[in-house]
Amino acid sequence: MKHQKQLATALLLAAACSLQAQRSETLLEKNWKFSKGDIKEASQPEFNDTQWESVVLPHDWAIFGPFDMNNDLQNVAITQNFEEKASLKTGRTGGLPYVGSGWYRTSFDTPADKEVTLLFDGAMSEARVYVNGKEACFWPFGYNSFHCNVTPFLNKNGKSNTLAVRLENRPQSSRWYPGAGLYRNVHLIVTDKIHVPVWGLSLIH
C-alpha cells in the first residue's frame, strides 16, 4: 500500500511538471497606450490611439495630479464619529484626481490552437476587458485580482490581437485613496487545451 501511494505521488508530480512545461506566462508590461476619459470607440481594433500617452505597467493615472481639494470634496456624515448630519469634507483621498474613466490599449500575439487567459493582478476599478472589440469579461472589484479566458475572442488568421481595458472610479466610491488604472501587473498565460486552469486544482479538457 505504501509503495502504491509513493507511485501515485510520483505520477502526479510528473504530470504536474509536464503541464507546467506546456504553460507559458508573459508580463504585458510595455507598449501600452492610455487616455483619461470615456472614449466610445476605444474598444475597437481599428481605433487610432497614436495620440494617446505611452505608459508602462503598473500605472496609476491619478498619482501625477493635479492635486486639488475639490478632487475629493464629499458631502458625507461619518457615522463612526457619531455625525448625524452630512457636511463637506476634503482630503480624505489625498486630493488626487482618481474619479473618472480611463482606457488602456495594447496588442499581443498567441500561437494557434492554444488556450489563452489574461490575469489582472489589480485594476481599479469596474474593469471591462475587450479583445478584438468584444467584451471578454467584467470585474467590478478594484482590490481583487481576476482572470478571464479570452480564447473565443482571438484572431484565427495569425493577426495580432487588440486588448482594450476600460476602468472607472465613481464619485464617493472610497473613503481613502483607492488607486486608479492598471496599478498591478497583467499576465498573458498560454496553455494547451488540456491544462490546469488559473488557480485550479484539477485538470480540464
Residue map of PLM features:
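Accessory beta-strand-rich segments of carbohydrate-active enzymes
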Residues: 24-28, 37-38, 94-204
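Generic low-complexity, intrinsically disordered sequence content enriched
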Residues: 11, 15-17, 32, 61, ...
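Surface-exposed acidic, glycine/proline-enriched linker/cap segments
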Residues: 84-92
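Bacterial Sec-dependent N-terminal signal peptides
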Residues: 1-24
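Serine/threonine-rich low-complexity intrinsically disordered regions
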Residues: 1-4, 68, 85, 111, ...
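Accessory carbohydrate-binding/adhesion or oligomerization-edge regions at the termini
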Residues: 21-85, 162-168, 182, 187-188
